[in-house]
């Protein structure tokens, strides 16, 4: 199935039905009075997150989604039937934005999470509501309200703990295939990966994290070169970025330092917040470097790149160094999660609305002695 991570659709909620202006006409009831019922409400448009869906392809060509209108009210105090709601099922990780106002309507981060994105119109009132002591046969009634109408943008941002960055053929897909059960396409030509891949890395019982591999970036991606930088949105929810560098390129004219700097520049052009995320350097394909040259090549790269953060040396093909990297990643994610939970608990404690009422001190006389009986 083709991977689609962005779509624009129009959602139109149903209009409310009109109220009825009807009079009761019945044998032996000379003054029946008003009996017009209310109109039914219009159907709403509801978005639901579904973990069994992983693309927005259903909304790439179905551009308009309409809910049913409410029925009009009728005589004999009969209310109109409400319009049926329609449900739009979307992948977990989808954000819904109003294109006119820029308002973020919903961020679907949990399975079965539902959000109303267009509300149906209210039904009109029948003339039964306008009866009074001075107006016993009202002819007034109200029309139903129109349903909400919106143009919305759907964006899918995959949910992952760790994201992989790197040039095409840096070994990102080989790495995710080595440490997880993901089966990405792997070949010796650029842009083998055309869509994000997710893999679950297990480091022990009940100890795992999710890793995301996106198509490779090249210099000028911000201007649309290669596949552009559209897939970088899938790294916005991650807590850690692994910058994978090919330390043994096939072409001797390729400069790993220049390529690594180009990746960082493209990251910064796309989103400053993404650029400031924790980022580790992973030097890959060390199995292709002679052992007596490894230390010198690594030192020369780090000096040229000007990097002073965490560095890991691995071979995704042979698995060398991958286990230690995965354990370090899990420890980082666990520590970050614990710190986040502690901060949330602190915020909650500071936001207590009802505190225990303090006890009033016991009354005593001015002299401090028991009162005389």
Swiss-Prot record:
Domain Obg: 1-159
Keyword Lyase: no
Ranges where the record places region Disordered: 128-147, 354-373
Binding site for Mg(2+): 173, 193
CDD domains named among the record's database cross-references: Obg
Residue ranges constituting the OBG-type G domain according to the UniProt record: 160-334
KW Cytoplasm (keyword) present: yes
GO process annotations (BP): ribosome biogenesis
Main location: cytoplasm
Keywords, sorted A to Z: Cytoplasm, GTP-binding, Hydrolase, Magnesium, Metal-binding, Nucleotide-binding
Cell location: Cytoplasm
Residue ranges with Low complexity bias: 359-373
GO cellular component: cytoplasm
Enzymatic class: hydrolase
Subunit-structure text: Monomer.
HAMAP family found in the cross-reference section: GTPase_Obg
Function: An essential GTPase which binds GTP, GDP and possibly (p)ppGpp with moderate affinity, with high nucleotide exchange rates and a fairly low GTP hydrolysis rate. Plays a role in control of the cell cycle, stress response, ribosome biogenesis and in those bacteria that undergo differentiation, in morphogenesis control.
Family indicated by similarity: Belongs to the TRAFAC class OBG-HflX-like GTPase superfamily. OBG GTPase family.
The protein's name: GTPase Obg
């Amino acid at each position: 199935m083709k991977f689609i991570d962005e779509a624009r659709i129009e959602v139109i909620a149903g209009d409310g039905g009109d109220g009825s202006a009807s009079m009761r006409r019945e044998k032996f009831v000379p003054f029946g009075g008003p009996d017009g019922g209310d109109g039914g409400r219009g159907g709403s448009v509801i978005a639901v997150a579904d973990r069994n869906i992983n693309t927005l392809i259903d909304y790439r060509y179905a551009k308009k989604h309409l809910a049913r209108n409410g029925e009009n009210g009728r005589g004999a105090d009969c209310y109109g039937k409400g319009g049926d709601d329609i449900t739009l099922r979307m992948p977990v990780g989808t954000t819904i934005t109003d294109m006119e106002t820029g308002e973020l309507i919903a961020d679907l981060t949990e399975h079965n999470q539902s959000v109303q994105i267009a509300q149906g119109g209210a039904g009109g009132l029948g003339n039964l509501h306008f009866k009074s002591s001075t107006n016993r046969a009202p002819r007034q009634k109200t029309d139903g309200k129109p349903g909400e109408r919106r143009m919305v943008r759907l964006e899918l941002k995959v949910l992952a703990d760790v994201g992989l960055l790197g040039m095409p053929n840096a070994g990102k897909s080989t790495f995710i295939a080595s440490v997880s059960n993901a089966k990405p396409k792997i070949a010796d030509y650029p842009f083998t990966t055309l869509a994000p891949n997710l893999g679950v890395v297990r480091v022990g019982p009940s100890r795992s994290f999710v890793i995301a591999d996106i198509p490779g970036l090249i210099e000028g991606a911000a201007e649309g070169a290669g596949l552009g930088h559209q897939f970088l949105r899938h790294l916005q929810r991650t807590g850690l970025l692994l910058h994978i560098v090919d330390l043994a390129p096939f072409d001797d004219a390729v400069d790993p330092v220049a390529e690594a700097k180009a990746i960082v520049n493209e990251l910064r052009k796309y989103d400053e917040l993404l650029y400031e995320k924790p980022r580790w350097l992973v030097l890959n394909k060390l199995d292709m470097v002679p052992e007596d040259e490894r230390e010198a090549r690594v030192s020369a790269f780090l000096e040229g790149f000007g990097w002073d953060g965490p560095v890991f040396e691995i071979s995704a093909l042979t698995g060398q160094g991958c286990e230690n990297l995965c354990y370090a990643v899990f420890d980082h994610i666990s520590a970050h999660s614990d710190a986040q939970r502690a901060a949330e608990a602190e915020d909650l404690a500071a936001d207590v609305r009802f505190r225990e009422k303090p006890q009033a001190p016991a009354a005593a006389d001015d002299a401090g002695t028991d009162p005389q009986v």
